[in-house]
Amino acid sequence: MQLNEVCLRANRKLSVLRSVKILNRQTLDLLYKITLRSVIDYALPVYFNNLTQKQKMRLEQIQYRAAKLVTGALHLTSKDKLNTELGWETIKKRSEILGLNIFHKIHRYETRPLIRSCMPKIDYERENNLRSKGAYIPFKNYGSKFNSSFFPYHTKLWNTLPKNIKALNITDFKTFTNTMKPTRYKHFQKGNKYANSLLTRIRVGRSQLNQQTFSLGQIDSPECLCHHKEESPMHYFLDCFLYLQERQAMLQLFEHYIPNFNLLYI
């Protein structure tokens, strides 16, 4: 089966990624996209929507394990928070984006004629209606499996797009579909792997800070060693007297790069 082969190949690539996990985050992110995600992407829009929920989760789980390797995140980290942290779309969203790009390419007659013959007919009456966003007549209902196959599913999805988007060339259309992806914060990749991993764990809410560890039921109290009621990120960075020297060194470094930063801090 296609899915089993994809998962087998992806897990092999994941093993390679695991062997070089000490590399910096930017490099690991790039390696994931070049080696592992390219395996998942192959024919993904064609078969993804006909998978069962359990089968879809197998693909999502592979990406989740890769995200933990890239960021150095701990076990039980939220999958959604990791995707937001990295600026990665879910496998489902990626399937839709890739499918729309392929469908638009076929619509623009930039593929072989044979595949164009699989397209539905253009709804000229609705196309001339200024209020209508539709361009193709939807396929007849032949059951959920047929409706989830490539052409019926992406015809329906493509018909929901605004007319000005449908008129774009393929390059501009891909620029549009890229806006459907989560925002990517490049400064999250800065620093060496260890320091970057520590900051990432705090951002995604799964660090060794007592507040975050307590929320998972791994310790009995969120109290800080200084006896503050919660060892939260805010308390850790700005208030706890146990880290006064480290905080002063951090603020001096900020002041060096950002003049008058101390005024903002106060």
Regions found by a protein language model. Give the residues of each.
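Basic, alpha-helical interaction scaffolds
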Residues: M1-V46
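Structural motif
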Residues: I22-I34, E89-S95, N141-K145, H187-A195, ...
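Extended, well-ordered alpha-helical segments in internal regulatory regions
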Residues: T35-N50, E96-N101, K105-I106, L157
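Short, charged alpha-helical motifs in flexible N/C-terminal segments and linkers
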Residues: Q55-E127, H235
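Amphipathic alpha-helical/coiled-coil segments positioned at domain termini
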Residues: D80, E85-E89, R94-I97, N101, ...
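Amphipathic alpha-helical
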Residues: P113-Y153, R184-F188, R203, L216-I219
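Family-specific functional microsites
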Residues: N178-I266
